[in-house]
Curated annotation (Swiss-Prot):
This enzyme's EC code(s): 2.5.1.19
Quaternary structure and partners: Monomer.
A Pfam family matched in the record: EPSP_synthase
Active site per UniProt: 313
Gene Ontology terms describing biological process: amino acid biosynthetic process; aromatic amino acid family biosynthetic process; chorismate biosynthetic process
Locations listed in the record: Cytoplasm
Protein name: 3-phosphoshikimate 1-carboxyvinyltransferase
Length: 427
């Protein structure tokens, strides 16, 4: 297996222009495909997940052109739901941001489409979304294991009263929200359980509004969506920088700055993960907010005990930053780490122990006490981009770290390690 050894880093300083947000990129691509008119998306993320969405849209007959660097995309909207000529199978890798929204959108009208993906995708639950779509009369068949992809979709979704469990993934609600306006009838979506990752729902609602669709949000408990609507192209749309990707550079600055400035997001960003900067500030770093940047300057870091449900992806970065904080850090309410690219709670606990931390892994929490000195370790990344990026922070100590399968960052940030090296000074 390929590996990358990072030598100790004495200091980080500089500016990072963030790649586009994965969450925003894939939502914007799908809405542009469903919309009337031509949409130009700029600062689109070029990554595996986005390529899976683009390949799926092409297979569904959506016409688009990409710039050479794949960050500018012109899409000719379909002016309504997407249909395949005859039976079709779409392979979506391990891209939850493609699988979930497409599973819903392709239930409109009549289709015969199979959605499948990598082995890990077949372990990521989708039953709550399927149950909800079936309440709206969608015809969906599980082809292997009940409640998991691959799925056969045969259209039929008309709207109506739909319940969805919000406790595992907000992507199920996102998928329903994006599909419901194109259904023939009104849809009332009722949330069962506690809604996780609420800020990701705000991204969805924000984008739907940009594409001309309003819905009624009743305190995140119930959403009322008028049927028979259509999406309208906003013309040009700039994809925000990826706030989860920003977390690694901001944390690096908190630990070994200097000052690092990330551009492409700012105080008015729609992504909940910008709140990560508040957590660093609470730990002792200095944060400065601009309209299109966030900067972080080093501080003495102290441990925290916090509910991280609102920033599940960026919270992983706090788990490795905790290695550099004084005291024991506890991250709570993070059960949904277990249903991501890998079981992130198990993976994080396992790898933190390798570098010498004392770790308590709970059902939905993790408690981390750093060692006096970090051990050298080979870090397994579980084909999970965030594991690779999180553990790069270990190099901010006096100890090198080896990252196995470093190219797995291609899911959201193909040149992550080059960018980190650019702002780093060797010890």
């Amino acid at each position: 297996m390929e590996s990358l050894t990072l030598q100790p880093i004495a200091r980080v300083d500089g500016t990072i222009n963030l790649p586009g947000s994965k969450s925003v990129s894939n939502r914007a691509l799908l809405l542009a495909a469903l919309a009337h008119g031509k949409t130009v998306l700029t600062n689109l993320l070029d990554s595996d997940d986005v390529r899976h969405m683009l390949n799926a849209l092409a297979a569904l007959g959506v016409s688009y052109t990409l710039s050479a660097d794949r960050t500018r995309c012109e899409i000719i909207g379909n002016g309504g739901s997407l249909h395949a000529e005859g039976a079709l199978e779409l392979f979506l890798g391990n891209a939850g941001t493609a699988m979930r929204p497409l599973a819903a959108a392709l239930c409109l009208g009549s289709n015969d489409i199979v959605l499948t993906g990598e082995p890990r995708m077949k372990e990521r639950p989708i039953g709550h979304l399927v149950d909800a779509l079936r309440l709206g009369r969608a015809k969906i068949t599980y082809l292997e294991q009940e409640n998991y992809p691959p799925l056969r979709l045969q259209g039929g979704f008309t709207g109506g009263n739909v319940d969805v469990d919000g406790s595992v993934s907000s992507q199920f609600l996102t998928a329903l929200l994006m599909t419901a306006p194109l259904a023939p009838e009104d849809t009332v979506i009722r949330i069962k359980g506690d809604l996780v990752s609420k800020p990701y729902i705000d991204i969805t609602l924000n984008l739907m509004k940009t594409f001309g669709v309003e819905i009624e949000n009743q305190h995140y408990q119930q959403f009322v969506v008028k049927g028979g609507q259509s999406y309208q192209s906003p013309g040009t749309y700039l994809v925000e920088g990826d706030a989860s990707s920003a977390s690694y550079f901001l944390a690096a600055a908190a630990i070994k700055g200097g000052t690092v400035k990330v551009t492409g997001i700012g105080r008015n960003s729609m992504q909940g993960d910008i709140r990560f900067a508040d957590v660093l500030e609470k730990m002792g770093a200095t944060i400065c907010w601009g309209d299109d940047y966030i900067s972080c300057t080093r501080g003495e870091l102290n441990a925290i005990d916090m509910d991280m449900n609102h920033i599940p992806d960026a919270a992983m970065t706090i788990a490795t930053a905790a290695l550099f904080a004084k005291g024991t850090t506890t991250l709570r309410n993070i059960y949904n780490w277990r249903v991501k690219e890998t079981d992130r709670l198990f993976a994080m606990a396992t790898e933190l122990r390798k570098v010498g931390a004392e770790v308590e892994e709970g059902h939905d929490y993790i408690r981390i006490t750093p060692p006096e000195k970090l051990n050298f370790a080979e870090i397994a990344t579980y084909n999970d981009h965030r594991m690779a990026m999180c553990f790069s922070l270990v190099a901010l100590s006096d100890t090198p770290v080896t990252i196995l399968d470093p190219k797995c960052t291609a899911k959201t940030f193909p040149d992550y390690f080059e960018q980190l090296a650019r702002i780093s000074q060797a010890a």
